[in-house]
Amino acid sequence: MAFLASGAYLTHRQKVLRLYKRALRHLESWCVQRDKYRYFACLMRARFEEHKNEKDMVRATQLLKEAEEEFWYRQHPQPYIFPDSPGGTSYERYDCYKVPEWCLDDWHPSEKAMYPDYFAKREQWKKLQRESWEREVKQLQEETPPGGPLTEALPPARKEGDLPPLWWYIVTRPRERPM
């Protein structure tokens, strides 16, 4: 999985926290009854708390490695995956039913009055988008070589120091490749 490749860039604390959360999720798959799960979750928390203030980083790293190995051997063979999570049965299933943003333009003023904060921020966003559109298209045309690709492989529509365009995720790719 792509998100596991970034483990080298995590701090020790982040690695421990992620291990703890994964362990709790797998424990939830093992213990169906909530009271039983809560009891074992408290025991697991106590085991993590024992070494919370470990000052020796070599020892802390060794403890983390041992905990990762123990997790590997005790993990559930079919952990519960929430339906809307990546790998779940409904992940990205209902994206086609999401209402597009432009449909909110057709709301009656009395309907918009029920959500004044949202529509005030939305109007600011639309104004900013209209103001920056020409500048961003010009920048995109400057960065695209003549006869270059006109598909998804467009250059990034962002120069160093500029704010990211409000629409760049639709028509361009990010400047750096994600790791």
Curated annotation (Swiss-Prot):
At which residues is N-acetylalanine found? Answer: A2
Modification Phosphoserine, positions? S85
Question: Quick check: keyword Mitochondrion in the entry?
Answer: yes
- Which CDD domains does the entry mention? Complex1_LYR_NDUFB9_LYRM3
Region span, Disordered: 136-162
Q: Which residues form a coiled coil?
A: none
Compartments, as annotated in UniProt: Mitochondrion inner membrane
Predominant localisation class: mitochondrion
Question: Which biological process terms from the Gene Ontology are attached to this UniProt entry?
Answer: mitochondrial electron transport, NADH to ubiquinone
Disulfide bridge map: none
Q: What are the UniProt keywords, alphabetically? A: Acetylation, Electron transport, Membrane, Mitochondrion, Mitochondrion inner membrane, Phosphoprotein, Respiratory chain, Transport
GO cellular component terms attached to this protein's record: mitochondrial inner membrane; respiratory chain complex I
- Topology term for the membrane: Peripheral membrane protein
Q: What exactly does this protein do?
A: Accessory subunit of the mitochondrial membrane respiratory chain NADH dehydrogenase (Complex I), that is believed to be not involved in catalysis. Complex I functions in the transfer of electrons from NADH to the respiratory chain. The immediate electron acceptor for the enzyme is believed to be ubiquinone.
Spell out the subunit comment: Mammalian complex I is composed of 45 different subunits.
Q: Which family does it belong to?
A: Belongs to the complex I LYR family.
Q: What is this protein called?
A: NADH dehydrogenase [ubiquinone] 1 beta subcomplex subunit 9
Please tell me the species this chain comes from.
Pongo abelii (Sumatran orangutan)
